[in-house]
């Protein structure tokens, strides 16, 4: 029988790269991993906390289509401030943290980076190491599966039909230069008592080809009917 494997781990070292870059002695390796986990959790919690403070961004619904509108004057968003990945590079006296984000309006706010650095220093107790945080804006946000998953989650929490949310997510990928996409949602869809899975696929998706650059994410969505699981595969290109 065929066994399923994580598409990112399957391609690690070929089309996917590590998100942490550092060396450590074997006895200190676990401490380094725990420190990376604390850094990533602290950044995500900071984004989540500031998003909940209030937002003027709207997701406008029309009878024919739904459009996400981003107000640049606002500090946070409902489904736009999504971190795609966090890269950590450690040197002897410096920790470099690179945050890749779709729409970095929140972190461009005056004093936001300084506040985040203080929170991180308290979390990891970095006394002898200097912390350096930089922000990288994702050039094509809608080719990132994390952003699409967050969009679907926002739609489902607002009682939008799951099929409509999936189709709209597929439509958003037309703005990006990709060759294939697959969206799968599992759980009590539509409030039904029996859990099931629905899937929509468009274009090519060569999961068995290692040289094919495929981005993937698995995202849980908490609804009033229970937890739904969203999986998104995006075939970017072939190397």
Curated annotation (Swiss-Prot):
Example GO BP: translation
UniProt cross-references to Pfam families, sorted A to Z: Ribosomal_S3_C
Subcellular location: Plastid, Chloroplast
GO molecular function, one term: structural constituent of ribosome
GO cellular component terms attached to this protein's record: chloroplast; cytosolic small ribosomal subunit
InterPro entries cross-referenced by the UniProt entry: KH_dom-like_a/b, KH_sf_prok-type, Ribosomal_S3_C_sf, Ribosomal_uS3_bac-typ, Ribosomal_uS3_C, Ribosomal_uS3_CS
Superkingdom: Eukaryota
Keyword match Zinc: no
Region of interest called Disordered, as start-end residue ranges on this chain: 50-80
Main location class: plastid
CDD domains (UniProt xref): KH-II_30S_S3
Domain KH type-2: 43-139
Keywords for the protein's UniProt record, in alphabetical order: Chloroplast, Plastid, Ribonucleoprotein, Ribosomal protein, RNA-binding, rRNA-binding
Family statement: Belongs to the universal ribosomal protein uS3 family.
Assembly information from the UniProt record: Part of the 30S ribosomal subunit.
NCBIfam families noted in UniProt: rpsC_bact (TIGR01009)
Protein name according to UniProt: Small ribosomal subunit protein uS3c
Phylogenetic placement of the source organism: Eukaryota, Viridiplantae, Streptophyta, Embryophyta, Tracheophyta
């Amino acid at each position: 029988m065929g066994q399923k494997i994580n598409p990112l781990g399957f391609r690690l070292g070929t089309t996917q790269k590590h998100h942490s870059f550092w060396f450590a002695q074997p006895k200190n390796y676990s401490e380094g991993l725990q420190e990376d986990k604390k850094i990533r959790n602290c950044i995500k919690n900071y984004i989540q906390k500031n998003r909940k403070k209030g937002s003027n961004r709207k997701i406008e619904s029309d009878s024919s289509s739904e459009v996400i509108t981003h107000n640049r004057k606002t500090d946070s968003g409902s489904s736009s401030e999504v971190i795609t990945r966090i890269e950590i590079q450690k040197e002897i006296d410096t920790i470099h943290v690179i945050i890749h984000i779709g729409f970095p309006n929140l972190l461009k706010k005056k004093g936001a980076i300084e506040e985040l650095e203080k929170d991180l220093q308290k979390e990891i107790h970095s006394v002898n190491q200097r912390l350096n945080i930089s922000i990288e804006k994702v050039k094509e946000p809608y080719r990132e599966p994390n952003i699409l998953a967050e969009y679907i989650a926002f739609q489902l929490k607002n009682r939008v039909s799951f099929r409509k949310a999936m189709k709209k997510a597929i439509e958003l990928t037309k703005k990006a230069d990709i060759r294939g996409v697959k969206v799968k949602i599992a759980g009590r869809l539509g409030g039904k008592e029996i859990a099931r899975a629905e899937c929509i696929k468009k274009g090519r998706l060569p999961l068995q080809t290692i040289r094919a650059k495929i981005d993937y994410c698995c995202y849980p969505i908490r609804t009033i009917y229970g937890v739904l699981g969203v999986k998104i595969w995006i075939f970017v290109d072939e190397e």
